């Protein structure tokens, strides 16, 4: 799709239009602080591109089952793997802990909204559970979720572990998309 955000991403050297969702959320809620950043579901790499620019005395770890279009530079590590795999989780833990976990991950879509939202829910819950293991106290978490009914459970889980919780639909989300983001700030209440 060649819309305003896709064209802007190309002009500004980002790998995907999705970066503008992260930029908008960060400008409103100041996600980045000192420390390590974990990007789950990093492919094609635009969230990682932006996160790398925002790093403050830490490392960026990008994780995905697919390769990403970024060169390996200082303080950047790419873990190719599935977050449901013990080996991948071990690598993530070895490089942590993290002050911020961001995720624009989405399951492979089928076109069946019920199936897609269910798969998104399961993936989101896994990302949250993993984040709870690797976040430092007062760390932040941003996760993409497909709306479909079960997202209230995700919101409640965020409320249980974070001082500040917000459901966000950035302007860069396509009109026909049912994706939203959940933000949790200040882990460990």
UniProtKB/Swiss-Prot annotation:
Its EC number is 2.1.1.166. The keyword Cytoplasm applies. The active site is at residue 144. GO terms for cellular component: cytoplasm. Keywords: Cytoplasm, Methyltransferase, rRNA processing, S-adenosyl-L-methionine, Transferase. S-adenosyl-L-methionine binds at residues 45, 47, 64, 82, 104. It catalyses: uridine(2552) in 23S rRNA + S-adenosyl-L-methionine = 2'-O-methyluridine(2552) in 23S rRNA + S-adenosyl-L-homocysteine + H(+). The keyword Lipoprotein does not apply. InterPro entries: RNA_methyltr_RlmE (IPR050082), RNA_MeTrfase_FtsJ_dom (IPR002877), rRNA-MeTfrase_E (IPR015507), SAM-dependent_MTases_sf (IPR029063). GO terms for molecular function: rRNA (uridine-2'-O-)-methyltransferase activity. It is found in: Cytoplasm. Specifically methylates the uridine in position 2552 of 23S rRNA at the 2'-O position of the ribose in the fully assembled 50S ribosomal subunit. Belongs to the class I-like SAM-binding methyltransferase superfamily. RNA methyltransferase RlmE family. This is Ribosomal RNA large subunit methyltransferase E. The lineage of its organism: Bacteria, Pseudomonadati, Spirochaetota, Spirochaetia, Spirochaetales.
